[in-house]
Amino acid sequence: MPLNEMVSVVTNLVERGYIRKKSVVSALLSVPRHKFVPKYLESSAYQDNPLEIGYGQTISAIHMVGIMCEELDLDKGQNVLEIGTGSGYHAAVVLEIIGKSGKLTTIERVFELFNSAKENLLKFGYNNIEVIYGDGTKGHIENAPYDRIYLTAAGKKVPEILFEQLNDGGILLAPVGTYNQYLIKYMKINGQIYEEILLEVSFVPLIEE
């Protein structure tokens, strides 16, 4: 892995205040991003930009993955749901943070990406993950409730069923909107949902059935 390239990117993100937690820094440095992009884009893997992964989907920029991990306040042992596996890169970073005592359920709507991400994640030895092919907007009740839920694609609103699958005290993070999108942090406290608008973003649209 071109560690020096990622060190440079992560150092810059820390200096700019995007990343504060040591666990997020360590996770970003541990996951070889170039292994989660198409071969012809491997040389661009450590540029802090979104990259095409085919089928109209992208891998998020490094700073966005870092910001989302920070805002989710991830910790070891948590039960996490990811909507939109993509190439599996974001999932790998999350798995590094929640550790072997944690559990990640991730759902991908594009069959080809589901297949390649599952193969890739298992190849790197992650065995506390369940990769599911299907409509992520329905969540996955079988592994609920979740301590953390995050979406890697934007919809007009967050499906209510996802809030139902969120633990009390849990956090849900999602890009919301169509042309103008915002990353919104939802917190479930005593059964009530509170939201905080974090920043303007640009994500691919959420695919629904």
From Swiss-Prot:
GO-annotated cellular components: cytoplasm
HAMAP family documented for this protein: PIMT (MF_00090)
Catalytic activity as recorded in UniProt: [protein]-L-isoaspartate + S-adenosyl-L-methionine = [protein]-L-isoaspartate alpha-methyl ester + S-adenosyl-L-homocysteine
Disulfide bridge partners, by residue number: none
Domain of life: Archaea
Designated name of the protein: Protein-L-isoaspartate O-methyltransferase
Function: Catalyzes the methyl esterification of L-isoaspartyl residues in peptides and proteins that result from spontaneous decomposition of normal L-aspartyl and L-asparaginyl residues. It plays a role in the repair and/or degradation of damaged proteins.
UniProt family annotation: Belongs to the methyltransferase superfamily. L-isoaspartyl/D-aspartyl protein methyltransferase family.
Subcellular location, principal: cytoplasm
EC number: 2.1.1.77
Subcellular compartments: Cytoplasm
MF terms in GO: protein-L-isoaspartate (D-aspartate) O-methyltransferase activity
Keywords noted in UniProt: Cytoplasm, Methyltransferase, S-adenosyl-L-methionine, Transferase
Active site, per annotation: S60
Keyword Metal-binding: no
Entries under PANTHER family matching the protein: PROTEIN-L-ISOASPARTATE O-METHYLTRANSFERASE, PROTEIN-L-ISOASPARTATE(D-ASPARTATE) O-METHYLTRANSFERASE
Keyword Transferase in annotation: yes
GO BP terms: methylation; protein modification process; protein repair
Pfam families registered for this protein in UniProt: PCMT
